[in-house]
């Protein structure tokens, strides 16, 4: 009889940044690790977010014992409002992570039905045949954890997002002693964060950012505007501390930033002992050199507070000449264009802008190469699987693992949807499941597919031509010349002759086709074909051609 194997299947987070989601399956038990979203790429027109395809989980809903969240960043929690109502399983996380998830679920009116279980760092719990332990890791957010997962075939360590920082601003350092203990007992598989596997050396401490923010507030002649991710609680604390030192008041701007700040204050993860935080209605009459704004918009999101300020579109606040704007975040891949446009607009408004290329106003929360090697040497896993990163990150992390003595045959560089099957002696990729992207477009989730995106790209690039064909209902004959309406294709005044010629071309095509009204599909195809060819010959463009038939 074949012994059961442990299946490990990534649903997101491999060969991409964000959308982190992993499942483990043993016999009739499944646990899910993280459920994040990622930002759309530039060609994903009109898409707000991208989340993992959970078809595999929906087909096995009865086997899912829970979702485990390693920390509160959106790339690990952002899919929960969309998938929890479908799966209806409990979520296990630390206290701050629960608070951040609650804010997100409340915004989507999904909180009342959710079951959120709080587990402290160091806590242990059992889900089916899996025994899970949270161990503290240092990241750019408090209450981040890695996972020790005891399975019937051996111990698995999941690093979560981590770095080695001995002087964290808030939260605990990564528990290296626990990792060393695990290494002496024996670890079957290590899955570790690869986001910054390209960078040599060590990741700088978060203290560096605090020192630079302090310097900015000491020297800025006017208002200071700081933008970061709303979930970067430790960064917001650094702003409050620096503002208090320099007699400035802090105003929180942006709905998500406000909600997160209020939650973190309530739970005790943010401290404001000197009453530095203020409301916008207290702003009037305050000297500019006593003002700090903390706002959303670090990724150039079009509807964020900072972008609206940069475009002079914010209802309450505008950029003033002499403002200092600090972008305390690095661009998520795909958002570079949005951020650069925002920076340009801020400069145009007369602001001084500080960002990663000009000042160290942000450090990332991920381990660099020496920290990754330290983790590998402490844990001493039999097998290794790099996670969280694009292919180059995973590949470089795999090379690091080889450099510390893990055999190449024991290292698994997977893609989303790959099925890795493990037993105590060996592991191999045995197949692939349906995985990929589900697009969130406003209120629509999952009904935007590749065809819709292709059409949007076509419209944005080459425009649209609508052909209105009037047909006699009785005879099926064309009545007059077709009308052609163009948008985003050509200047109708300059291309008047070409559009007139295309009207004649459609009329001749229909006269020769002999199509009856019942043969509209044939008419539709013929009109599209002839106009696509004609317009490409004339302009080297391929507008979307939409024929409409009106029967009178």
Region spans (language model):
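Conserved hydrophobic residues forming the short capping helix/wall of the S-adenosyl-L-methionine
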Residues: 105, 401, 535
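Short Gly/Ser/Thr- and Asp/Glu-enriched loop/turn motifs at secondary-structure junctions
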Residues: 120, 415, 541-545
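His/Asp/Glu-rich metal-coordinating catalytic cores
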Residues: 1-68, 73-285, 304-318, 337-341
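A glycine- and charged-residue-rich anion-binding loop/surface
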Residues: 14, 38-42, 63-64, 355-358, ...
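Hard-cation-handling environments
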Residues: 198-328, 332-520, 524
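C-terminal tails and terminal domains of large nucleic-acid-associated
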Residues: 517-552
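Extended hydrophobic secondary-structure segments that form protein cores and membrane-embedded regions
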Residues: 118, 294, 546-550
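Short glycine-rich phosphate-binding loop at a beta-alpha junction
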Residues: 90, 385, 544-547
């Amino acid at each position: 009889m074949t012994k059961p194997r442990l299946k490990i299947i990534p649903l997101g987070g491999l060969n991409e940044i964000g959308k982190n989601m992993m499942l483990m399956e043993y016999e009739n038990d499944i646990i899910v690790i993280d459920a994040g979203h990622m930002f759309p790429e530039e060609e994903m027109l009109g898409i707000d977010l991208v989340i993992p395809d959970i078809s595999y989980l929906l087909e096995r809903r009865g086997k899912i014992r829970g979702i485990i969240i390693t920390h509160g960043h959106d790339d690990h929690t952002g899919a929960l409002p969309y998938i929890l109502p479908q799966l209806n399983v409990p979520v296990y996380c630390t206290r701050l992570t629960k608070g951040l998830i609650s804010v997100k679920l409340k915004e989507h009116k999904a909180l009342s039905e959710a079951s959120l279980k709080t587990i402290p760092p160091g806590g242990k719990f059992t889900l089916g045949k899996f025994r899970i332990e949270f161990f503290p890791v240092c990241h750019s957010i408090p209450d981040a954890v890695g996972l020790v997962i005891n399975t019937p075939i051996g111990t698995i360590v999941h690093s979560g997002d981590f770095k080695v920082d001995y002087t964290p601003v808030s939260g605990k350092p990564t528990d290296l002693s626990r990792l060393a203990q695990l290494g002496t007992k024996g670890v079957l598989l290590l899955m570790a964060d690869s986001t910054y596997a390209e960078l040599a050396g060590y990741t700088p401490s978060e203290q560096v950012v605090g020192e630079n923010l302090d310097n900015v507030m000491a020297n800025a002649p006017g208002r200071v505007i700081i933008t970061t991710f709303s979930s970067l609680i430790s960064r917001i604390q650094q702003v409050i501390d620096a503002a208090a030192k320099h007699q400035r008041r802090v105003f929180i701007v942006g709905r998500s930033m406000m909600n997160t700040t209020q939650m973190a204050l309530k739970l005790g993860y943010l401290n404001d002992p000197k009453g530095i935080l203020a409301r916008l209605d207290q702003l009037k009459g305050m000297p500019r050199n006593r003002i700090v704004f903390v706002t959303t918009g670090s990724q150039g999101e079009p509807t964020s507070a900072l972008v609206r300020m940069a475009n002079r579109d914010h209802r309450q606040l505008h950029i003033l000449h002499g403002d200092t704007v600090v972008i305390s975040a690095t661009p998520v891949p795909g958002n570079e264009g949005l951020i650069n446009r925002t920076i340009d607009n801020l400069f145009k408004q007369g602001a001084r802008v500080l960002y990663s290329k000009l000042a160290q106003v942000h450090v990332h929360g991920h381990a660099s190469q020496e920290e990754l090697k330290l983790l590998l040497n402490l844990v001493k896993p039999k097998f290794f699987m790099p996670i969280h990163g694009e292919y180059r990150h995973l590949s470089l992390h795999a090379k690091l693992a080889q450099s510390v003595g893990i055999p190449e045959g024991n290292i698994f560089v997977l893609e989303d949807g790959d099925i890795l099957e493990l037993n105590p002696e060996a592991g191999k990729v045995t197949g692939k499941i349906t995985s990929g992207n589900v697009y969130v477009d406003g209120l629509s989730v999952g009904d935007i597919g590749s065809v819709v995106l292709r059409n949007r790209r076509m419209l944005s690039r080459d425009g649209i031509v609508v052909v209105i064909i009037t047909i006699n209902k009785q005879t099926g004959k064309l009545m007059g010349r077709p009308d052609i309406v163009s948008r985003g294709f050509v200047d109708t005044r300059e291309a008047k002759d070409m559009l007139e010629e295309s009207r004649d071309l459609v009329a001749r095509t229909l006269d020769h086709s002999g199509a009856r009204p019942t043969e509209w599909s044939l008419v539709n195809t013929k009109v599209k074909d002839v106009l696509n060819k004609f317009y490409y010959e004339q302009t080297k463009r391929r507008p979307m051609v939409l024929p409409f038939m009106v029967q009178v």
